[in-house]
């Protein structure tokens, strides 16, 4: 049975991705710091689930954690933090948390798990970016970190591609998650006007794209960002 590590698995896109991999028969290592709303039932799936409670702001502890996981075939760097702070009044603690969870933790996880993937000449890494990487996003540090995620996707693909490891990203548009629900109604109305279907994505729709890149996409799809934004940023 293949194993996937999914960060931010407790809710939203991470929870939907957990269900998708379980439904495909995978062993899922679901990592989050809060499982209070976690329900990962996947009808008909033959997968296995293990919960890992870990705070990704503890970037210094990631190497030891990764060493305890055993073989990981696919890594999904999904965990993310967003605060709706005005740019002129961003608390330093919020900035540090966003940088740690959204950018530093994915780098640390890839650094820790890539050697075993290289040794097997097989592995897949899927980083979750955002349409915020391409736009002038009102949540300043969130946009910065998501742009960084897409850059590091290409950088790691260039380093690992010759060793049989695929590194790709998914850049979702507005998606019905806890983060989305934090937005003011004016932002939600803007979202409805910006997408072709007039609605935010369902987490399960984004999870389907992640599952494909994490399990079945062609080997020549590498260093690529898959847009999943329904026209909110056509390019």
Indicate residue ranges for each PLM-predicted region:
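Active-site helix of classical SDR
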Residues: 110, 145, 153
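Short C-terminal tail/terminal secondary-structure segment
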Residues: 222-235
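Alpha-helical segment proximal to the catalytic Tyr-Lys
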Residues: 115, 158-159
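Active-site loop-to-helix junction immediately N-terminal to the catalytic Tyr of the SDR YXXXK motif
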Residues: 90, 136-144, 155
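Substrate-binding pocket helix/loop in short-chain dehydrogenase/reductase
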Residues: 86-87, 91-99, 180, 191
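Residue(s) in the substrate-gating loop at a strand-loop-helix junction
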Residues: 130
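Short, small/polar-rich loop/turn modules that mediate ligand/substrate recognition or access, typified
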Residues: 161, 166, 221-223
């Amino acid at each position: 049975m293949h194993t996937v590590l999914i960060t931010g698995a407790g809710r939203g896109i991470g929870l939907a991705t957990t269900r998708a991999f379980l439904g495909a028969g995978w062993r899922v290592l679901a990592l989050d710091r809060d499982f209070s709303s976690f329900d990962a039932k996947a009808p008909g799936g033959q997968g296995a689930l293990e919960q890992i409670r870990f705070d990704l702001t503890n970037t210094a502890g990631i190497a030891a954690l990764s060493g305890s996981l055993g073989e990981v075939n696919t890594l999904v760097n999904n965990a993310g933090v967003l605060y709706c702070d005005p740019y002129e009044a961003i608390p330093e603690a919020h900035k540090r948390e966003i940088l740690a969870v959204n950018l530093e933790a994915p780098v640390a996880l890839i650094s820790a798990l890539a050697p075993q993937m290289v040794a097997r000449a097989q592995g897949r890494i899927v980083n979750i970016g955002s349409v915020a990487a391409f736009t002038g996003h009102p949540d300043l540090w969130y946009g910065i970190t998501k742009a960084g995620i897409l850059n590091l996707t290409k950088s790691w693909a260039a380093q690992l591609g010759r060793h049989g490891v695929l590194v790709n990203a998914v850049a979702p548009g507005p998606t019905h998650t806890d983060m989305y629900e934090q937005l003011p109604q004016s932002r939600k109305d803007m979202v409805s006007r910006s997408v072709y279907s007039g609605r935010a994505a369902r987490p399960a729709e984004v999870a389907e794209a992640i599952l494909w890149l994490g399990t079945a996409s062609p080997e020549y799809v590498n260093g690529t960002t898959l847009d999943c934004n329904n026209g909110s940023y056509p390019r």
